[in-house]
């Protein structure tokens, strides 16, 4: 299979995932298996993909005493580069993706931590970025779509190469060896076993190889990487960013509908930041466990627990997300009543009905899109969507867990609005 055939398969994978509401790096298991096997047998495929594999791997591993964690860091950097190229290909109209801040958390911690500035700039130049000043890279002219697919595929291949090298180290029994010997053995071998045998013979000439460092617990799941948020905004958090704002979803035009953290990392504020949102004591909030890093497939999302108002508040909301009233006067009737405000104080306020399920949703069906302007939940192929897309605020609901929670919220809003005393 040539590089052009791989590029076409990779492109189809990205567009298939976009139709499912996900705009991210490739996770197709069959394409992954095919590319893995080709790379194992032929390291020179990297040359056909023009991904600068040897230069990037040498730069990222040079001088590292323990190669295993260095390879994991490189894989995460290549994933972030792949994501940047995928964003430009799938969502070229999103202006957020045309500017990368070199002082952002993703750039400083994930990219610059493992790769040199010159190689990073070269990688971004392939995507059409040029250095605007000492703090920003900007796209002045978007490259052809086929070039962006080729760059993203190259980064995907580099991620797999890091995993292949990690498998070699695991079978070798040590990850403490010179990087140049590992890369030399990898280029000279046609499979993992022969690469391991070559290294074993080489290490036996020197001394007994040191033992493999103890494996730690599986890395905690980290939010899908993006490149757009300032360093001061995400410093100390696991969510790395390269752009000015959190990454938006594929069908959400304005910047305020940017990508949101996973459900288990979201804030516990159902009614937004306007007014004094009630916060339960810390001990009342159960700590949700995180799935292993890399569990990006929809099927691996944690099943939501039994529905409750507390879980809905915790899972669904975060600052600026719910497009709810901005002032305390427009807060939830239940919350105002809980704070001791007389019912007459809010009955005089014309309160919106909250979110509602559009008529396109059949009973039991989960929504795919949420319009924050119409405050309605829609199916993916709703006939009313063309009227919303030009100027309304659309967000994509990713995964069954989030879709189910939004549907439950709409049902709750409807109940609150229709309940006695909810309206004047």
From Swiss-Prot:
Keyword annotations: Phosphoprotein
Similarity comment text for this entry: Belongs to the SPATA2 family.
Pfam families according to UniProt: SPATA2_PUB-like
Species of the source: Homo sapiens
Modified residues (Phosphoserine): 327
Keyword Phosphoprotein in record: yes
Region entry Disordered, spans: 233-258, 273-300
Presence of the UniProt keyword Phosphoprotein in the record: yes
Gene: SPATA2L
Coiled-coil blocks: none
Gene3D superfamilies, per database record: 1.20.58.2190
Cellular component terms per the entry's GO annotation: cytoplasm
Name this polypeptide is given: Spermatogenesis-associated protein 2-like protein
